[in-house]
Amino acid sequence: MKTKLQNLFMAALTLAASTQKLGVNLIRVAILVIFVWIGGLKFWNYEAEGIVPFVANSPFMSFFYTKSAPEYKEYKLKEGEFNEAKHQWHVENNTYGFSHGLGILIMAIGILTFLGIFSPKIGLAGAALVIVMTMGTLSFLVTTPEVWVPDLGSEEHGFPLLTGAGRLVIKDTACLLYTSDAAD
């Protein structure tokens, strides 16, 4: 009986070890899909306009824009909205040019991470870039006022109450944890 239990236990451990590699590879596929999709969206004006508060307030990225941080608030557009004057401001700000470059970078990171299925060295480079990008994204929790519910008269505002933008940012902690583990 003891030998059968030991054999069963060893078989279970062997199966678990083999599924770990499958699980890591499935996560790589998921990162490819997500990063190529999000990177591709950076070529649409609404997405480029949507990241302006993050980039404009970041001490690490604001130099990509030509306008100062508080100015963007006057030129915000709702998703799907078009206003020629506001659009022109975004053209002059390099909103679209920066977003296109960021989109290419995000897609490349997704592809490198996916290629880790076939080449561990390439996958490690992709994972390292995901970590760097995710740390930059998480820095928005400190630099971007729009990630916290504003004080508009309610008692429900500030830390730890995240806005939609804040919730978008905080979910990157899961990506950071995966890639930190996958980089081992």
What does each of the following model-derived ranges do?
Residues 178-184:
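Conserved small/polar residues in nucleotide/adenosyl-binding loops
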Residues 33-102, 135-152:
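Solvent-exposed, well-ordered loop and adjacent helix/strand elements within mature globular domains
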Residues 12-22, 90-97, 117, 121, ...:
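Juxtamembrane loop-transmembrane helix junctions in multi-pass integral membrane proteins
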